[in-house]
Amino acid sequence: MTEVTIIIPNYNGKKLLENCIKTLERQTCQEFKLLVIDNGSKDGSTDVTSESLYMEMVALPENTGFCGAVNLGLEMTTTPYAILLNNDTEAEPEYVGELLKAIESSPKIFSVSPKMIQLYHKELMDDGGDMYSIMGWAYQRGVGQEIERYDRPCHIFSACAGAAIYRREVFEEIGYFDEMHFAYLEDIDVGYRA
């Protein structure tokens, strides 16, 4: 049984999307559905296909932003888990399998954030999940730091929605992403509500 749907929001990112899908074709765990929500692209993005994956492309007439796109994807999804994946990411071969293993380790886990590495500086972190400070501010964990410092799992306040897995039933309880956040900070808002 397919347990996870990967939802990729896209806006005029044809080349990025093609590369992202190629990395998904190399996943060791292929038990996923792929859903691309295109936000009214004019660059031919809706012509992108996969050679080996079943992929559904939903072409929206206008740009609804990150939240609008992923909310539609979450509404269309019937799998227990959903991975939200930015089109400019490159997933390592164990990505899907490791995220599934982590979220299935406890029914109390709502989301899991992978160790996100900078695209052009592979020795540096891009994001290791969001944390919450004593001052009441949320911040990205590990940005610009050496990746070796972030090899152990830890509790985080919220997962970066650019590459995280979520337990879909929790969204049904707390609501989807707030579309007032066209792009950015939507994942922190979900962390507050979860």
Regions found by a protein language model. Give the residues of each.
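A conserved acidic beta->alpha catalytic loop
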Residues: 23, 38-47, 62
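A short, conserved alpha-helix in the catalytic core of glycosyltransferases
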Residues: 157-194
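Glycine-rich, basic loop-to-helix element that forms the pyrophosphate-binding segment
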Residues: 60-77, 87, 98
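Short, acidic, metal-binding catalytic loop of nucleotide-sugar glycosyltransferases
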Residues: 22-31
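Conserved donor NDP-sugar-binding/catalytic core segment of glycosyltransferases
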Residues: 90-133
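Cell-envelope/extracellular polymer assembly enzymes that use nucleotide-activated donors
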Residues: 2-5, 33, 189
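Short aromatic/hydrophobic "clamp" motif used to bind/position activated sugar donors
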Residues: 82
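Short, flexible, basic/aromatic active-site loop/helix in glycosyltransferases
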Residues: 114, 133-156
